[in-house]
Design a protein with these regions (language model features):
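Amphipathic alpha-helical core segments of compact helical bundles
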Residues: 162, 166, 170, 323, ...
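Noncatalytic, helix-rich "gating/capping" subdomain that lines the substrate-entry/channel surface
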Residues: 1, 6-10, 14-192
Length: 509
């Protein structure tokens, strides 16, 4: 309670400080304190009508096809003014849209103007005067995230350029940092993971033959995007001023170009070859509406992937991530989409019920877990097992399937996962880690652990619990490994103090 009140007070102070850069005449006769209070009051009203994080990720609740002409008049006006053509739209939160329409009419126009000024100032603070950027960082960087200093100016500059012309930078990144043979190796790993999923789905005890065949059909339709797009995006028509130009004007030009680019897609068939991220993004993605997985070039480096590493390490790191992303196609939300990306009920009711029995156990395992960095710091909300369910299913399936894939890889060569050095395009790899020798299965789990070694500030950890559908890194590592039988096979001593009690362990995929 005290912490919330402190945060709310900081929120008002932050806006007061930022709005203080304006002359009162620019704030419609209000001073910065009153303006800040009115902005926060309006934002609070808007936020109160948002759905919670669990409902917001529900693919059925958020799929509400509606004709533009059926929306409240003022919402139609706003969308039309933004360039959206007539036709069908998907309304994710119908009740929120209705309440927003009411606020647009009932809240004084001056409050909306102040809110617009604040929103623009906040979004452009990083490219305005140094004192504006510093004031913005003081709250969003220090108060909310715990950071003590801004990133170097050149790093902020690169991030800005990436936000405006990301794929152009991606070309240069790929040319310099992405070896051609990495793509071939990744595709080989993907094949091993897909085959392992097919093997597991074919023998699932809780799934009926009818649903099993549809799941295998979806798996066969998966597409993998590795490294970089086959066709680069064109930025033709986007013009920036050069030396001595106006930085804010350049940012506005980039934002307008991106807006027009996105609006132009409306009403047209989805481009299944388009990428959801730039090659220099350190992340991986599953896109349910096109049923594909994406692995940008930048994630294909240690600790996730190393073309010169031991097979166990690549299966335990990037292999588990591949399995995680494929697993999103079969998590609590992704499983509602068919192999062509359509929201379609392809499960029998009985299979869906059995699936939800298993996922309920997983929710229970994670619910309320408090990350180490927040222990002893007063009341913490802890992990929300429902909110993080999709990512936890992905993690659990990803590592479990990676173990199967690794065993299959070794079996093809007549090798034993409990034996010494087993390599994958890596003649110089070693079984030693920090001077101690481990067998293949052990090295796979150690690679998984290495991926999740993380340092995080308490402020950021608390923020992530509220907004991030992923569990904290320590639980992504330990809870997942604790559910997998091969972990205790690899480390028998772990059974004495099991990470997850044997009767509570969950295997879904």
């Amino acid at each position: 309670s005290t912490r919330k009140e402190s945060s709310a007070a900081s929120d008002v102070y932050k806006r007061q400080q930022m709005l203080g850069f304006f002359h009162p005449t620019q704030l419609f006769g209000t001073g910065p304190i009153e303006a800040a209070e009115r902005v926060v009051a309006l934002e609070t009203q808007i936020a109160s009508h948002h759905w919670d994080v669990v409902a917001s990720r529900d693919s059925l609740k958020t799929y509400n096809p509606t004709e533009l002409g059926e929306l409240p008049d003022i919402i139609q006006t706003l969308l039309t003014a933004s360039g959206l053509p007539e036709g069908r739209v998907i309304v994710m939160m119908p009740s929120f849209v209705d309440k927003l329409a009411e606020l647009l009419v009932s809240v004084p126009l001056t409050d909306w103007k102040l809110w617009a000024i604040w929103s623009i100032l906040r979004s452009r603070a990083g490219v305005l005067r140094e004192d504006v950027g510093a004031a913005n960082f003081e709250f969003y960087g220090t108060v909310l995230s715990g950071a003590t200093e801004q990133r170097d100016r050149w790093k902020r500059g690169v991030a800005l350029a990436e936000s405006l012309v990301g794929e152009d930078l991606g070309k240069a990144y790929v040319d310099k940092h992405f070896p051609a043979d990495s793509k071939a190796q990744m595709l080989e790993l993907v094949d091993y993971l897909v085959d392992a999923y097919e093997q597991r789905i074919s023998t699932l005890p809780w799934m009926s033959p009818e649903t099993r065949e549809r799941a295998l059909e979806k798996l066969r339709l998966f597409n993998a995007k590795i490294g970089y797009p086959d066709t680069w995006r064109s930025y033709e028509g986007l013009e920036f001023s050069r030396e001595g130009g106006d930085l804010v004007a350049n940012v506005r030009a980039g934002a307008a170009f991106e807006h027009d680019y996105q609006v132009a897609k409306v009403g047209k068939p989805a481009d299944r070859n388009e990428w959801v991220a730039t090659p220099q993004t350190v992340n991986a993605f599953y896109n349910p509406v096109v049923n594909d997985i994406t692995f940008p070039a930048a994630i294909l480096q240690p600790p996730f992937f190393d073309p010169a590493a031991d097979a166990a390490e690549n299966f335990g790191a990037i292999g588990a991530v591949i399995g995680h992303e494929i697993g999103h196609g079969f998590d609590d939300q992704g499983s509602r989409y068919d192999g062509h990306g359509n929201l379609n009920s392809w499960w029998t009711d009985e299979d869906r019920a059995r699936f939800e029995e298993l996922t309920a156990k997983l929710v229970k395992q994670y619910d309320g877990l408090v990350p180490t960095v927040l222990e002893g710091r007063g009341e913490s909300r802890g992990v929300n097992g429902e909110f993080t369910l999709g990512e936890n299913i992905g993690d659990l399936g990803g590592l479990g399937i990676a173990v199967i894939a690794y065993k299959n890889y070794l079996a093809e060569q007549g090798l034993d996962p409990r034996g010494p050095v087993q390599t994958f395009h890596a003649p110089g790899a070693t079984a030693e880690i920090d001077g101690q020798e481990f067998d293949g299965l052990q090295r796979l789990f150690l690679a998984w652990a290495r991926v999740w070694r993380t340092a995080i500030r308490p402020e950021m950890a608390e923020q992530y619990l509220a907004i991030d559908p992923h569990s904290p890194a320590e639980f992504r590592c330990n809870v997942v490994a604790g559910n997998i039988a091969e972990f205790y096979e690899a480390f028998p001593e772990a059974s004495a103090e099991a990470l997850v009690a044997e009767d509570d362990r969950v295997v879904i995929w």
